[in-house]
Amino acid sequence: MVRVRIRSPSWYDGVDNAPHRVYLRAVGFTEEDFSKPLVGVAVSWSELGPCNYHTLELARYVKEGVKEAGGAALAAPTIVVNDGINMGTPGMRYSLISRELIADSIEAQFNAHGVDAWVGIGGCDKTQPGIIMAMVRLNLPSVYLYGGSAEAGWLGERELTVEDVFEAVGAYYAGRITLEELKRVEELSFPTYGTCQGMFTANTMALLAEAMGVSLLGSATPPATSARRRKFAVESGKAAVRALELGIKPRDVVTYDALYNAAVALFATAGSTNAILHLLAIAHEAGVKFALEDFDKIGKRVPVIAALRPAGPYAMQDLDRVGGVPRLLKKLYKAGLLRGEALTVEGEPIGKLLERWEPPAVPEAGVLYDVDRPYKPHGGIRILWGNLAPRGAVMKIGAAEVLKFEGKALVFDGEAEAFKAVAAGEVKPGHVVVIRYEGPKGAPGMPEMLKVTAAIVGAGLGESVALVTDGRFSGATRGIMVGHVAPEAAAGGPIALVENGDRIVIDGEAGLLKLDVSDEELERRRRQWTPPPPKYKGGLLAKYAALVSQADQGAVTTPETCQC
């Protein structure tokens, strides 16, 4: 039986630590338990939405696996901010911030209590990168477990996801559907607990965790309601103890090659643009140099081979049915696009795991494609550069039918006013909606713009109106949408200088984001521009705004970026 204990003896062994042991005896520890490795279980649990509603149950299965492998497990909670509920509200400012809070809270709890290894259970969007950031920060043997996607809904023969509800709102305001039809979509689109069903941010990050090797192969796609989800919970508990025994730590796994593989998987699935922000943050925590330029190079080599929403018609449960992430990764590996030598938490390189893995005898049925005959020839996301984004911006070209667009700027200093303009019919074909002061510092918190983007698409303007912002997008976003513009407006980026009527050029093929205004005119505007005062003078949002870096740096909170 495993008895590797790398930290817990300093907390719990010997006469001097008798007062420490008494607290664990009070919660059920036996004398034998104190000789076992102490394995923490970080549970992001909440009843504020379906995404993490069931994670306490999964934690019990993880603890079973730890016990079977010879460890002693104790669970501790961390927070959840449900992006879908706070979309388009002041609450969205807390979404990205929660990623940092989750990483910080896990660091505090597990460093304070001397755990030897741990398992992190995530669900909703920011819980996953927050947990993985904590993994590489603590660098203790650890495994990530995804809570799983909700099942898709159905309206007749039409498969529904939460994306349909957001777009139905825009369709209602445009007079394309009735209130009764909107209500029907609302009632049917989310029938179970679990995360949003398409290749949106939560499912994207789960897929990338598997591609990075920090979670077990095959564990991303089983639905939240599936018995296989519980099986993976047990196996994840065992894997954490095994990683402790083998001495495998997250920084052995999260290397440049692992991040490279994650980026390949991201582009191949046209996943959420949020993943770029999160992978940059994970790289920062791991001490790995991985920048927007790396994404730019990788994205030009990788086609989209998964027809998953919002880029295609299928949901996560459909990918699971045809073999899940392993089938996707094996296609990429056989095509020479993955770095097979990257180590995984299972103790073997990902290439060896994929070579052994055999796909189910199920046709791919249009869900997955081959690399040489892809679903879309270009990668799902393109990095844009230009005088409007000197430090880069991102465009989800896999979910856009129009890759090149030129139009006149319609400028809003915030998302709320932009949504009102769309709902009132003031946004017309040929407009480039510019939403600024919604970046990491400016909002603060870099909120997602799904309410506006879905309203644009729902109004039938998805191919005739573009949107450019220093904020973020939901993984459910589609259309001509450019986000993460850096530097942001609040930091004096060129987006702060855009005026109504300015011509903006977007070229998703060439990777260009250009403001068609002379350098002399921009300099004149800059001399007249003054930075806005902080929106908050106290509390969490004020602290975050003072610490956070720009989007091209992952929007991490570090002493180096502190404006204290």
UniProtKB/Swiss-Prot annotation:
Q: Which residues are annotated as modified residue N6-carboxylysine in the UniProt record?
A: K126
Q: How does it assemble?
A: Homodimer.
Known PROSITE patterns for this protein?
ILVD_EDD_1, ILVD_EDD_2
List, separated by semicolons, the cofactors it needs.
[2Fe-2S] cluster; Mg(2+)
UniProt protein name: Dihydroxy-acid dehydratase
EC number from the UniProt entry: 4.2.1.9
Give the source species: Pyrobaculum calidifontis (strain DSM 21063 / JCM 11548 / VA1)
Q: What is the lineage of its organism?
A: Archaea, Thermoproteota, Thermoprotei, Thermoproteales, Thermoproteaceae
Q: In which pathway does it act?
A: Amino-acid biosynthesis; L-isoleucine biosynthesis; L-isoleucine from 2-oxobutanoate: step 3/4; Amino-acid biosynthesis; L-valine biosynthesis; L-valine from pyruvate: step 3/4
Residues the entry annotates as binding Mg(2+)? D83, D125, K126, E448
Q: Does the keyword Lyase apply?
A: yes
What terms describe the molecular function in GO for this protein? 2 iron, 2 sulfur cluster binding; dihydroxy-acid dehydratase activity; magnesium ion binding
What is the role of this chain? Functions in the biosynthesis of branched-chain amino acids. Catalyzes the dehydration of (2R,3R)-2,3-dihydroxy-3-methylpentanoate (2,3-dihydroxy-3-methylvalerate) into 2-oxo-3-methylpentanoate (2-oxo-3-methylvalerate) and of (2R)-2,3-dihydroxy-3-methylbutanoate (2,3-dihydroxyisovalerate) into 2-oxo-3-methylbutanoate (2-oxoisovalerate), the penultimate precursor to L-isoleucine and L-valine, respectively.
* UniProt: [2Fe-2S] cluster binding residues: C51, C124, C196
Q: How is the cofactor bound?
A: Binds 1 [2Fe-2S] cluster per subunit. This cluster acts as a Lewis acid cofactor.
Which family is annotated? Belongs to the IlvD/Edd family.
The protein's gene is named ilvD
Q: What biological-process terms (Gene Ontology) are attached?
A: isoleucine biosynthetic process; L-valine biosynthetic process
Which reaction(s) does the protein catalyse, per the Swiss-Prot or TrEMBL entry? Answer: (2R)-2,3-dihydroxy-3-methylbutanoate = 3-methyl-2-oxobutanoate + H2O; (2R,3R)-2,3-dihydroxy-3-methylpentanoate = (S)-3-methyl-2-oxopentanoate + H2O
Active-site residues (renumbered): S474
Q: Which UniProt keywords apply?
A: 2Fe-2S, Amino-acid biosynthesis, Branched-chain amino acid biosynthesis, Iron, Iron-sulfur, Lyase, Magnesium, Metal-binding
